[in-house]
Swiss-Prot record:
The keyword Nucleus does not apply. The gene is murG. One of its GO terms (molecular function) is undecaprenyldiphospho-muramoylpentapeptide beta-N-acetylglucosaminyltransferase activity. GO terms for biological process: carbohydrate metabolic process; cell division; cell wall organization; lipid glycosylation; peptidoglycan biosynthetic process; regulation of cell shape. Belongs to the glycosyltransferase 28 family. MurG subfamily. The keyword Glycosyltransferase applies. It catalyses: di-trans,octa-cis-undecaprenyl diphospho-N-acetyl-alpha-D-muramoyl-L-alanyl-D-glutamyl-meso-2,6-diaminopimeloyl-D-alanyl-D-alanine + UDP-N-acetyl-alpha-D-glucosamine = di-trans,octa-cis-undecaprenyl diphospho-[N-acetyl-alpha-D-glucosaminyl-(1->4)]-N-acetyl-alpha-D-muramoyl-L-alanyl-D-glutamyl-meso-2,6-diaminopimeloyl-D-alanyl-D-alanine + UDP + H(+). This is UDP-N-acetylglucosamine--N-acetylmuramyl-(pentapeptide) pyrophosphoryl-undecaprenol N-acetylglucosamine transferase. Pathway: Cell wall biogenesis; peptidoglycan biosynthesis. It is an enzyme of class 2 (transferase). It comes from Borrelia garinii subsp. bavariensis (strain ATCC BAA-2496 / DSM 23469 / PBi) (Borreliella bavariensis).
Amino acid sequence: MSNKKRIFFTGGGTGGHVFPGISIIQKLKELDNEIEFFWIGKKNSIEEKLIKEQNNIKFIWVPCGKLRRYFSFQNFTDFFKVILGIIKSFYVLKKYKPQIVYATGGFVSTPTIIASSLLKIKRITHEMDLDPGLATKINSKFANKIYTSFKESEKYFKNHKNIIYTGSPIRKEFLTPNPKIIKQLTQNTNKPIVSVLGGSLGANALNNLALFIKKYAEIYFIHQSGKNLNDLREDNYLRRQFFNAEEMASIEKFSNIIISRAGAGAIKEFANACTCVILIPFKKGSRGDQIKNAKLLKNQNACIYIDEDEILNTNILKVIKETLNDREKINSLKENIKKFNNKHSSTLIAKLLIEDIKETKSK
């Protein structure tokens, strides 16, 4: 084992599998500036882009194949990519000798977790969603510890002895949102602000929805579209492909209503912001994780839930206007979503990891 303190993070595919890791690294840097950080992910991916924007995190790519629950001829070629990913991860980990490998989810994390198991490196896998994905289910077979973002997730890991409910880490920018930023973005509007957020990869259904509802001039609309649409500003409408962390924190905190997908990371940010949300979970081609996330909130009256298949049959503008005019409903939704807040999650996890490093180095 190396004398240097090193932690390897691995995960990706969406921002929801990357931002929590960045949050943990931010907190670890505050608590112990001697730790070196590495991130293993896929080449030319969202995780590579996001990690390379950070300071002092070395990104290393490995081959990886998608893990599927259904038959596909790609399963055969992807199987060999997974094997290659395990082999490269093995040699990378053997070279750098980290004390911990931390998986944040996504199929890219599995080769590294398996390789770290072969090398007897301490392994932690963190399930961000309520319902574990296939990657986490596989990772859990090799992990020493499982961290969960929802208390309700523990039932999916009954056979594992070391499960810790940590919550989902939130980036430090979201803990102190700046009200001046939302004023700059909306040009000091006095109108109610409704923000449509498509996530790190964008969302066609939400993009189409935003283009429809922006015609209503009595509301100021903020639209985060992903790379499929160009940036645009109109009288009551601002569209950007991406907002930075400070901008997004201000948008989530000071918008009157947020319309969003139902990824676990986004939900935890909304809970931290204590905001009123309309959730339209991703359905087609997904494993249903966002639907379960959204229904958990719906059942606790913490969000307005709209099924993706019902978008065309739902008068979204009517829902928005009725909600804006119902102060009691807004207050109730805000109070209930606040129960899902884990603003101290990054600190908790960082302290656990520092203890793990001390324990490993003392052996």
